[in-house]
Amino acid sequence: MRFNAAITGALVSSATLMGQAHAEETEKKADATSLVEKPTFTPTTIEAPFLEQFTADWDSRWTPSHAKKEDSKSEEDWAYVGEWAVEEPTVLNGMVGDKGLVVKNVAAHHAISAKFPKKIDNKGKTLVVQYEVKPQNSLVCGGAYMKLLQENKKLHAEEFSNATPYVIMFGPDKCGATNKVHFIFRHKNPKTGEYEEKHMTAPPAARTTKLTTLYTLIVKPDQSFQILIDGEAVKNGTLLEDFAPPVNPEKEIDDPKDKKPADWVDEAKIPDPEAKKPDDWDEDAPYEIVDEEATMPEDWLEDEPTSIPDPEAEKPEDWDDEEDGDWIPPTVPNPKCNEVSGCGPWTPPMKKNPAYKGKWTAPLIDNPAYKGIWKPRKIPNPAYFEDKTPSNFEPMGAVGFEIWTMQNDILFDNIYIGHSIEDAEKLRKETFDLKHPVEVALEEASKPKLEEKAATPSVSFKEAPVTYVREKVDYFVGLAKQDPINAVKQVPEVAGGLGALLLTMILVIVGAVGASSPAPAAAAKKGKEAASAAKEKASEAVSSAADTAKGAATKRNTRSSAQ
């Protein structure tokens, strides 16, 4: 048992030293956000049909719209009153000097556009559309998608609206249960000349956090497309197979003039005409019958009514028997019935009738006259056409954001529209790949840390030792569930105390099993006494180590303030 005491003493000393070391470590910690090193924005040298980083001359390219939104479902006029600004992020800013286009108003219609230096013709080429979205207040209900507008010499930026013809719509949209990344393109029917929107099926979910998200769309001349989020592919498909309605109509359609013959038999099954109802089939037998074997419970009070006059009720003072009639007190449930199985006349319960069979019907058999499900004959589709290259989008002359959102401060940046996958990746490495890790670090640093919780018990050890120890242990267990190593660092006194207790119990068990003393009862008694003593020392270790650590920290703080 002297060995156990020595071990316990050593652990207590270790816990004290660990507590002092931890106090010093906590004292040295600085604000995590100040330790995050941010890169500085440098304009790219990449050239593209359209590349926007919202540098100082951005307003020479972008024009807010002052048009009115067209809405056939409402008589009210909606103007694009939402304001725009170019500024650095105010939330999780991951790059010094990096400005973006920011939505400034909540619950407002916003529209802004920029013309391309020259129209973008994608015939026979790869189209790459890439841009950053940073919802600084998260994205709960609103759009953050862009539109590539159809080339039109008559297009005036100030008149840009939801009615302005676009070629491609791409980007995130979130509201309620809707959460997706749009990819829609308008396709012209070569026979009728009419345009039809083709919507990508099974769209991926949008990212709605306050971090910058990079959305990339790649459409290749082989009609395949790919959507990437933060540089990772989230959707692959083809323009000919993954859009609704499909680009090309069916070659054949149902003949609208074809009619089902009058003698066509649609019934696959019919009642068996040779089947007969069994002689013992009783259709009149009831579904339930009285349970003749049931007996009245012994505590059933047949003479007690289920309700009685309310003994606490009193006749109103203004009650006139001549005018109002005899006053009858209201009734209340008989309290005696609550204590027994029931009151009043007893009737036996019902039970399912074993002889019940219900109405007899003949079993079904295959209909020998069945001809199958009738379908009209097929005829060639007069509106059929085949467009094998829908990626040859119509020429595009501008890019615009035409959105409505309940959140402001949505930031757009680093827009690339061109034909080079390599250049888009290079731009990503120059911008997103540098700022995004910083934003993640800033977000992590801004989260409340576990050690920020009430690590100090609500009472002192002298006031309530049991409560003090329990709160310390609970705090240690909560930390250990997420990070055991951090738990030992944060509450070393509890770790040391629990370790001492565990080691003592192991030694007691080993000693009890391997003891060869002729007096086992005495040995067991000594073991229990030793275990009890160890527990007391472990509790003392928790309090003394904590007090030692607190004292050390207090002394150091005092010296710091004095300096």
From Swiss-Prot:
SUPFAM superfamilies registered for this protein in UniProt: Concanavalin A-like lectins/glucanases, P-domain of calnexin/calreticulin
Residues with an annotated glycan are N236
Localization of this protein: Endoplasmic reticulum membrane
Residues that span the membrane, as ranges: 494-514
The positions making up the signal sequence are 1-23
**GO BP term, pick one:** cellular response to starvation
User: P domain (Extended arm): where is this region?
Assistant: 253-386
Q: Where is this region: Disordered?
A: 241-323, 521-563
The alphabetized UniProt keywords are: Chaperone, Disulfide bond, Endoplasmic reticulum, Glycoprotein, Lectin, Membrane, Metal-binding, Repeat, Signal, Transmembrane, Transmembrane helix
Q: What does this protein do?
A: Interacts with newly synthesized monoglucosylated glycoproteins in the endoplasmic reticulum. It may act in assisting protein assembly and/or in the retention within the ER of unassembled protein subunits. It seems to play a major role in the quality control apparatus of the ER by the retention of incorrectly folded proteins.
- Protein name as catalogued: Calnexin homolog
Native species of this protein? Aspergillus fumigatus (strain ATCC MYA-4609 / CBS 101355 / FGSC A1100 / Af293)
